[in-house]
Amino acid sequence: MKIVKTSLIAACLGAFALCGAEPYLHFPLNEGDVSKIKEATGKVAKVTVWNSKQFDVVDGPDGKAFNFNTPDQCKTYAGVSFNMPPAFDPTKGFTFTALVKMPENMHRSRQYQLFFWSNSHQQGPGIRIYVSWKSFYVLLGDGSKKPLLLTSKNSQGTLKDNTFYRLAASYDGETLKIYIDGVLRGTAKGVMKKSTRKWAAIGASSQSGSAYGFNGIISDVKIFDKALSDTEIAEMKPEK
């Protein structure tokens, strides 16, 4: 058991040892082969790859990365789903972070789904993280018609086409914060409830049908079971 636990910790820590924070879950998404995604993360959570033919292997920030190829008007979605450990409780605090490269000719009004663990797209309960109108959005729902929605929608928070960003969101049970390349871009106070959905997904909210998918690169996804500090998140910004 000690050997297994040690290997899991090493796999999860990865490049994060510098700031000392240990991810609860880590999806490198730099394996260069879709079939190896499960090998890299399967010991931590049961992983399923959605529509594997819609993944393109491209050069990424750390080895080969995956381009989630879900063009406009597409009805099947490239994604990576996994069973969220029952003990994980985002209402007590969490941080989500990922290296993201938006596509060329980003459609302004389209919703590019980064992370989905929610009972619904609009009210929750749960977490929904996406890009739309060239801005970073985080929605925390409690099941009511007034979810906590925070966006970077201003001149400084605009995301450019074909550009890598380190996007991050943290919540301490009261305050939600969003960051772009380590810089705080918005705060809001509110409450959320934990989703009752057993699985969460990266890159899409469903395999097919009426859903939202990502088009571009998602890499180095880390989920923490606490709200990281501004300093810890600033240390994560990608090298330009």
What is each stretch, according to the model?
Residues L139-R166:
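Short, aromatic/His-centered strand-loop micro-motif at the edge of beta-sheets
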Residues E22, P86-E104, G124-R128, T163, ...:
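A carbohydrate-recognition surface predominantly in extracellular/luminal proteins
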Residues Y24-D33, T95-E104, Y212-E239:
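Extracellular, beta-strand-rich glycan-interacting domains
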Residues N69-F94, S118, L150-T158:
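Short surface loop/edge beta-strand patches of beta-sandwich-type extracellular domains
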Residues L18-C74, P85-P86, I233-K240:
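Extracytoplasmic low-complexity segments
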Residues A188-I217:
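Flexible glycan-contacting loops in extracellular carbohydrate-active proteins
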Residues Y112-L140:
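Glycan-recognition/cleft segments
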